[in-house]
Amino acid sequence: MNKIIEKFIGYLRYERNASPETVDDYGGDVRLFEQFLTPPGGATLPLAEVDHRVIREFVSWLYDRNLQKVTVARKLSALRTFFKFCVREKYTRTNPAALVSTPKLPKLVPRVQTAEEINDFLDGLPGGAAARALPARKKNGRTRTRRATAKEQLMPRRDRAMIELLYACGLRVSELVGLNLGSFDRAGQMLRVLGKGRKERVVPYGGKAQQALEAYWPVRDRILGEAHGTPNAEAVFLNPLGGRLTDRAVRYILKKYCLLAGSNLDLHPHSLRHAFATHLLNDGADLRAIQELLGHASLSTTQRYTQTSIRQLMAVYDKSHPHA
């Protein structure tokens, strides 16, 4: 079964173009299922003998370990994807996980930052032209700050370009870090994005993102010029050593700027994607067009964003209408 799991992980990574987190999570979930199928000192139950009753026993086993419903639901989703892959590769004839219902989860509608909040945050991002004091360090009991190195002074230009692009295009973080130079049509301000399932879409970006990118290109050239070894000459967003930036690094960078802003904003890359869709919807954009821009396979996925918009409209109505 281990070889099948390795092939499944390769399928997620290279065919589904899944994010590193999804690959790690789903791989871990399936390995946990393999552990469940293997009694102490015994042999693993063959996949061909796994039916929906075994899947239900696994779900009960997860609950016995005090796992939350949302975690159980994700592991069940991983098994559905795994067995779908197994059917395709003819390791099994059916998908037993498809016959087991997902635990009912509370429908939580996330708060989406207003356009004003996002604009204030973006306007407050450093441009990277001036040297900045870096976090304090203690030496001999004294707190001291240090000046940023020449390369560190330039990193805010990269960071601003990334964050502007996340909001301008509604990108997934995996799509952002996967961008290559060939993804851009600079003259037309269009971006070719490789999304989930290796599906390609074209997304426009606006003037502010364009300005941020134009400020970043010389920084990128400098990183490549000073890099040791063989840098990634195709990747758009680079770390200081010339390698492709990771999605984990993007999350850290965004969190850092939220802390520097001193506001109550708790932004994640997906927060900007959600805000992108909600703000377009609030300004009258067609839901089908938003679906295309986000790269959603199903309109029902895009419709989740309407729930937040309706709640915001109701709040305005309740506050403003004399008979509310």
Where are these regions (language model features)?
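Conserved catalytic core of the tyrosine transesterase superfamily
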Residues: 1-324
